[in-house]
């Protein structure tokens, strides 16, 4: 999770359609020039409200398998293309190999005070076939595949560094949790790919990034892409249930204000279960007693490892689950707004949400600590 992303998008998105600089590469090499021109055309198609036609740039097999065949596109944020960050893109490295051209790009933005903000350093691999004149990108996941192992367990295909010793116990724990969720909620099994590494740096490298905004974070995190049935995560090993639940719930409930909080409740977040998040929120409220939870939908957190909105919604899910079980949780997912939810489920007005929520966070935190 990258909670500050939207702030930077709002500040800088108006500047993102900028120039691509190629002064550092050897444009006298015709193959390099061809690859650079191809790449520049690709970048130009990432506009404010549109994406490229991937079939023009990526192999047919990749486009048939993936809605987004480029693993770099949604690496900084899951809903905003990496290539739209920063107005200045500098291709500073171009090297020809026997079957492809390797390009490195620095993506930056300079603010009004001449401060340079670095968003990403990317690696792209352009395949050139001089006999057929075909040109296309090779996925970093394919280029880097020799560095990773693949292991299938149940419906999960794991991809992870060769240096990592696979933890069967954690994998079995995840499979057990998935099967219970499928049974309880009536979902059919899903086959999916699970890419994981021990750190953000390693995950970035797997996807073709030497650097990306937020890479310095050390806590567990991940992203899920239900359309492609893929999850990427770091620092949490073989059993990150949170992202897996997105594969099941997002296709049906992504627009529900309850969805992400429900996933917090069922799958925890940042490597911790929901009881830990309750305790963390209760501690946060004691540290910042002026926090008004009646405004939880729009509150900015002072702790980037605590998402107030999702944790509050998770608490609501816990209360309803204890009262009405899964049918109650399914009922919550039908609500379009929280005003109606609080009126129908708890018979309270917005001015009273703060007291109600704080009392329940304290109640459950006290129970957890007994």
Model-derived segments and their meaning:
Residues 1-23:
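Bacterial Sec-dependent N-terminal signal peptides
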Residues 16-149:
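N-terminal low-structure segments adjacent to metalloprotease catalytic domains
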Residues 29-37, 48, 164-175, 231-239, ...:
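Soluble non-cytosolic domains of exported or imported proteins
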Residues 36-40, 171-178, 241-245, 260-264, ...:
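Extracytoplasmic/secreted envelope proteins and their assembly/folding machinery
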Residues 42-46, 177-185, 320, 342:
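Hydrophobic, Leu/Ile/Phe/Ala-enriched alpha-helical segments that form helix-helix packing faces
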Residues 79-110, 235, 239-244, 248, ...:
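Short N-terminal secondary-structure initiator segments
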Residues 148-255:
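Juxtacatalytic substrate-recognition/specificity segment
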Residues 252-370:
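Acidic/His/Gly-enriched intrinsically disordered linker/tail segments
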């Amino acid at each position: 999770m990258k909670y500050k992303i939207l702030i930077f998008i709002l500040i800088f998105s108006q500047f993102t359609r900028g120039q691509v600089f190629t002064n550092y590469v050897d444009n006298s090499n015709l193959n390099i020039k061809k690859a650079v021109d191809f790449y520049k055309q690709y970048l130009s198609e990432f506009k404010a409200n549109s994406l490229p036609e991937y079939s023009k740039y990526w192999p047919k097999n990749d486009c048939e398998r993936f809605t987004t065949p480029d693993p770099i596109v949604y690496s900084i944020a899951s809903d905003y293309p990496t290539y739209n960050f920063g107005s200045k893109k500098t291709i500073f490295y171009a090297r020809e190999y026997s079957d492809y051209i390797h390009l490195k790009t620095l993506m930056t933005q300079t603010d009004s005070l001449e401060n340079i903000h670095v968003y990403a350093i990317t690696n792209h691999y352009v395949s050139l076939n001089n006999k057929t004149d075909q040109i296309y990108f090779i996925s970093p996941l394919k280029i880097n595949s020799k560095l990773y192992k693949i292991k299938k367990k149940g419906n999960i295909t794991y991809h992870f560094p060769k240096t990592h010793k696979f933890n069967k116990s954690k994998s079995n724990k995840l499979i057990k949790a998935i099967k219970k969720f499928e049974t309880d909620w009536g979902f059919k099994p899903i086959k999916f790919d699970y890419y994981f590494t021990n750190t953000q740096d390693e995950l970035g490298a797997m996807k073709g990034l030497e650097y990306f905004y937020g890479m310095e974070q050390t806590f567990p995190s991940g992203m899920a892409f239900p359309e492609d049935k893929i999850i990427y995560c770091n620092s949490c090993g073989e059993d990150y249930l949170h992202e897996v639940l997105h594969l099941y719930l997002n296709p049906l409930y992504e627009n529900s204000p309850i969805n992400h909080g429900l996933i917090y409740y069922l799958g925890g977040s940042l490597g911790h279960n929901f009881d830990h998040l309750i305790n963390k929120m209760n501690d946060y409220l004691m540290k910042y007693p002026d926090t008004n939870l009646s405004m939880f939908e729009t509150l900015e957190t002072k702790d980037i490892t605590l998402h107030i909105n999702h944790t509050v919604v998770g608490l609501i899910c816990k209360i309803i689950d204890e009262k009405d079980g899964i049918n109650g949780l399914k009922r919550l997912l039908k609500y379009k707004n929280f005003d109606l939810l609080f009126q129908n489920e708890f018979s309270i007005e917005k001015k009273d949400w703060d007291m109600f929520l704080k009392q329940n966070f304290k109640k459950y935190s006290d129970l957890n600590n007994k």
